[in-house]
Curated annotation (Swiss-Prot):
Record region (Disordered): 1-26, 82-131, 198-238
Induction: Induced by infection with the bacterial pathogen P.syringae pv. tomato DC3000. Repressed in response to drought and abscisic acid (ABA).
Residues where Zn(2+) 1 binds: 36, 39
Name of the protein described by the UniProt record: Heavy metal-associated isoprenylated plant protein 3
Organism: Arabidopsis thaliana
The organism's taxonomic lineage, starting at the top: Eukaryota, Viridiplantae, Streptophyta, Embryophyta, Tracheophyta
Amino acid sequence: MGEKKNEGDNKKKGGDNKKKNETPSITVVLKVDMHCEGCASRIVKCVRSFQGVETVKSESATGKLTVTGALDPVKLREKLEEKTKKKVDLVSPQPKKEKEKENKNKNDEDKKKSEEKKKPDNNDKKPKETPVTTAVLKLNFHCQGCIGKIQKTVTKTKGVNGLTMDKEKNLLTVKGTMDVKKLVEILSEKLKRAVEIVPPKKEKDKENGNENGEKKKGGGGDGGGKEKTGNKGGGEGVNMMEYMAAQPAYGYGYYPGGPYGYPIQAHAPQIFSDENPNACVVM
């Protein structure tokens, strides 16, 4: 009887030790850049190869990767970064050390703020607040991965408050106190494509209005010049008819020649002839 009791106690102890050694399954949420379905399938295969992984779900649109199983989330993140050579963010659960660091940083920031408030301001002048601007950018959206990359780069830039995307027109509207030129440079470097700043409609309307005004002013000046030239002639200038005077023509005129004739044989005049009895006599 004593031996049977000892065997039962040993079995219970062994079962308790197994339960203690087994780590409970947890849900780990990671954030990775997944450009397309091919990238997502590769990352899922890589995660499934790790020990303790039970299920893996990927969302390529948001770059979210959900993993369940008995595993260490920090080690999983580090190994995934090594294999994929991409930045992997651990959304949940956060390790205790990182939480403690965040709490310390928050406390330090609060202390600094309180000290700054206590210090007297040497300059009473307040710094000028940068105005909130709205910039419209034009660039090509190739696929869902490109859209996610654009959203990530824009949200990381300093001073951006919000953004909206128009996929049909390929327009990106950004609101905030950021430097638009720097934002354009960052996007063109990371995406390796042309990014244009679309000017607002008001500026275009003003430019068109100025051009029309200049044309009207120029036409009025010409009309004024014509009126001045007409007034110099007085009242006669109004009723004066304009005509083109014909230039004098110089030509070489020849009289028409007579018809061609033949010599006619006629008798010589008999007025002073001696043979004519009726002729005149010169004394």
